[in-house]
Amino acid sequence: VTGTTLGYSVGEPWNQKAVKKGFGVPVITSDVLWDNGADKVFGITTSFAEQNPNTTVKVVKALIRASSWLDENDYAHRKEAAKLIAQTNYIGVDEDIITNSLTGVFEYEKGDIRPLKSFNTFFTGQYGIPYYSDAIWWLTQMRRWGQIAETKPNNWYLETAQKAYRPDIYTKAANSLIAEGKMKKEQFPNLATATFIKPPQTSRLDGVVFDANKPTAFLAAFKIGNK
C-alpha cells in the first residue's frame, strides 16, 4: 500500500513493522493521548457464561495469570512472549518487531528509539479488572457520537454496565487463584468490598473530569456531541 495511504491508526506490531520495512513513520502513540487507555477486550455472551460457568471462570483465570506473568519482574518474560506470538500460527511477524513495544521501547523512525515503559501494561494498575466506571465511560462516548440514539438517564448507564461487565466472575477467578497458591491476595484490591466504580478522574485527552456517578453531567460538559 506504499504511496496509496496517507495515514492510518493501528495497534502493534504494525507500526513497528512499517518502520522496519521503511514505508511508514509513527506520528504519536495512543498512550500520549490517553494514558493507560483500554485496548483489547475479552467478551462472551451471557448464554455461554450461564451454560459454561466453570469454563468461563477458568478462561478468566488463565487471562489473569498470563497478564500477571507478562508484567512481573520488570517485564522479564516479555522477550519469551514475543518469541511465542511471533510464530506463524499466531501473528507471524518478525520477533524483533514484536519485542520492541513489548519490552518498553518504541522506534518512531529508523534509529529513533525511545523508552516507552507503560506502552503495554497488562496487570499492573488493576487494568484487567472489569470496572463498571470504565463501561460507563464507553457508554457516554457511544451516546456522544450517536451510536446510542436517544438521551439516557444516569441510572441507565450503571444498569447497562452491570449487564456487560462482570466483576463477579473476575472475583471468582481471582479468589480461586489465591486459594490455589498461584496468585497472592496482595496482588488484587479488596474485591469483596469493591464497588467497581473508580473515583472521578481527569482525562489527558480532553481535560474534562469524568465521574461515573454523573454520566449525563459529563456529557453536558462537552460543547460538541450528543448529550
Regions found by a protein language model. Give the residues of each.
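Small-molecule pocket liners
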Residues: G24, A38-S47
